[in-house]
Amino acid sequence: MITKTYKDISEEKFYKLYFDLVNVLKPTDQITYTESLVLIEFLLLKEEKYKHARFAARAKREVIKILQEKYDKKVSMTYMAVILANLESKGWIEKEPDGIKYFNKKHQAVVDRILTSNDYEEIIFKLKVKQNNEH
């Protein structure tokens, strides 16, 4: 068995690890490096004003500013719209009937469980190799 324990990592580092793990499980629609940077910054916005407007114009402007300051990445509103459309088409962002966009609910449930736990949480991969008698 292979195990790896992460102790007291930042929320940002957690998201990076989580996206990397999910990419291992998904043969298609994997999140790219730039998409993950952008999505992480949206998810790190904690103010109440972003709770139900996580991907709205105000949040987009804030994330663009953060990307410039933190990574020296210049992202236009047009390019931001393309990145968010890609994340939506890949299932990372979901649009509710009321038109509001949210982080995928299944991923959010896993993330919330891990982020609010006082103990270690496990993410388990189970593998079974097909037995083939032919070479």
How would you name each of these model-derived features?
Residues 85-101:
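A short, conserved structural fragment
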Residues 108-135:
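Short, amphipathic alpha-helical interaction segments positioned at domain boundaries
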Residues 1-9:
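General nucleic-acid-binding
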Residues 72-90:
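Short amphipathic alpha-helical interaction segments
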Residues 8-51:
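Short alpha-helical segments that sit at the start of domains
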Residues 49-70:
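Short acidic, hydrophobic short linear motifs in intrinsically disordered regions
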